[in-house]
């Protein structure tokens, strides 16, 4: 036995033990990650996507090059999808702004049925193609998709896109962490214009997840939100709104000005949401005051 070990200061011994335990835990974590990656990659059987059952009635293609696909496989935003399934009824209209490959829209389409509608807006051409494939996969005739973005005025905007798996982070706001590698020009409209021929009283729920562009989408739907009373689900992410040049608190204030109250969903229950100092990542629910 090395007797000199016992002559060392206790803090030195404790530090060494701590480093050993930390290295051991990192090694264990790395093994878990490696096993998880191996399992995930094995699901594709050499293909670029595989068909996954969201539930007994709805299928979705998940893609090997998409981080969002893996998140969906792991039960991404379960609280939010449960909320949508609880709120929507047959014959309702659901508006999905920032649809991506269609997680929420596919589930909604099954619920609202042939008497209802799902309106989708997805500006990224490659993501839109995958969305279209998922609609076809389920043979849904009640989903109407548009390859455009929404903002506070019509026209054309620069859209920043990822080529390395971060397609769910595509945004009209430039990224500060180099996730978005290139840019394209895409057409944009306003929500008020896009809903002009829709029976707006039938719109039960609007979901807005546009990576920091939420403020501009809401302002582009001002007439609709003030005149009608849809439930609105909005992503609050401070870093995204910072990239777009404003504070996430402006989203909170805009909907309050439109006559709404904010809630959060926890265990399928709505809880009143007072304004917080910081929102790292939350999906909040706005409901019109009665």
Predicted regions and their residues:
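Conserved acidic-Pro-Pro-aromatic motif
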Residues: 49, 193-290
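Short, glycine/acidic-enriched loop or turn micro-motifs at the edges of active sites
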Residues: 99-101, 125, 150-152, 210-214, ...
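Acceptor-substrate binding/catalytic loop of class I
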Residues: 125, 179-186, 236-246
């Amino acid at each position: 036995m090395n007797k000199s070990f016992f002559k060392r200061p206790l803090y030195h011994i404790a530090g060494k033990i701590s480093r050993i335990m930390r290295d051991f835990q990192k090694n264990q974590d790395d093994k878990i990650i490696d096993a998880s990656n191996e399992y995930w990659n094995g699901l594709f059987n050499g293909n670029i996507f595989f068909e996954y059952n969201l539930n007994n009635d709805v299928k979705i293609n998940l893609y090997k090059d998409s981080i969002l696909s893996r998140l969906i496989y792991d039960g991404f935003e379960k609280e939010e999808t449960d909320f949508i399934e609880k709120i929507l009824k047959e014959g309702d209209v659901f508006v999905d702004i920032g649809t991506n490959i269609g997680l929420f829209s596919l589930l909604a389409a099954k619920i609202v049925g042939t008497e209802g509608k799902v309106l989708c807006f997805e500006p990224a051409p490659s993501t839109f193609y995958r969305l279209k494939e998922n609609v076809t996969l389920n043979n849904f005739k009640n989903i109407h998709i548009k390859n455009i973005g929404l903002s506070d005025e019509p026209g054309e905007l620069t859209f920043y896109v990822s080529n390395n798996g971060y397609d769910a982070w595509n945004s009209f706001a430039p990224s500060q962490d180099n996730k978005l590698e290139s840019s394209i020009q895409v057409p944009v409209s306003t929500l008020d214009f896009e809903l002009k021929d829709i029976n707006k009283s039938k719109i039960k729920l609007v979901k807005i997840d546009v990576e920091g562009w939420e403020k501009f989408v809401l302002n582009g739907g001002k007439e609709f939100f003030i005149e009608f009373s849809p439930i609105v689900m909005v992503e609050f992410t401070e870093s995204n709104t910072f990239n777009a040049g404003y504070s996430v608190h402006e989203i909170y204030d805009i909907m309050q000005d439109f006559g709404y109250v904010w809630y959060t969903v926890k265990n399928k229950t709505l809880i009143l949401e007072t304004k917080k100092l910081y929102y790292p990542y939350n999906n909040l629910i706005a409901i019109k005051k009665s």
